[in-house]
């Protein structure tokens, strides 16, 4: 077979099949004769090596299981109705009992990969008739050195004129408390522009590594490192707000237990 000359070899465009394999997504490839679902599964980006995936997958990748942990993914829920006032309230969201179930920790160490806060804030019949606007400030805080009982909102945060919207962690506590996430929700009372309830739905990835002592009970006092606390406070001084929340954490056990 005679060889092609230089002009023919380098001026002929690349074949369509090769161009598609190089630049297009696998889902845009033409279906071959006698193709089966296994071939479509084999062409997905998730089943290809990292060097053959698009650049997006190489830059923004995160493992399903946190570093130093093992599956399965466990879950723990905290469901309660809270009375949120101007002075604030705090709850610990890493209270997990030691055990062998899907909602228990197997040892002292586990990692909270993500947290989901869902529910609503609302006003009762007597408060929603008053003309006012009330905003609830939520702050998810990491306590690096838990001890005793959780500190109150005013003990952790420095506020100007006792206003929760101006709350910042006190200077002498910044090495212990870290605000991981913060969000807010607003309700309005009155006769005309009334909004008596507001939906709260927040999902955050935190990757917080929690350490317990040798005790089995799910208590704040049994934490030794990195407890997660949810602080809540409303901006109105005289009208409280009720919060019906379901807080769910997704965590993995550490391989060093």
From Swiss-Prot:
Pfam families found in the cross-reference section: Gemini_coat
Record key words, sorted: Capsid protein, DNA-binding, Host nucleus, Host-virus interaction, Metal-binding, T=1 icosahedral capsid protein, Viral penetration into host nucleus, Virion, Virus entry into host cell, Zinc, Zinc-finger
Short motif (Bipartite nuclear localization signal): ranges: 3-20, 201-248
Motif (Nuclear localization signal): 41-55
GO cellular component, one term: host cell
Principal place of residence: virion
GO biological process, one term: viral penetration into host nucleus
Domain of life: Viruses
Localization (cell): Virion; Host nucleus
Motif (Nuclear export signal): 102-123
Gene Ontology molecular function, alphabetical: DNA binding; structural molecule activity; zinc ion binding
Zinc fingers typed unnamed, residue spans: 69-86
Self-association and partners: Homomultimer. Binds to single-stranded and double-stranded viral DNA. Interacts (via nuclear localization signals) with host importin alpha-1a.
Known function: Encapsidates the viral DNA into characteristic twinned ('geminate') particles. Binds the genomic viral ssDNA and shuttles it into and out of the cell nucleus. The CP of bipartite geminiviruses is not required for cell-to-cell or systemic movement.
Family: Belongs to the geminiviridae capsid protein family.
Name of the protein in its database record: Capsid protein
Lineage: Viruses, Monodnaviria, Shotokuvirae, Cressdnaviricota, Repensiviricetes
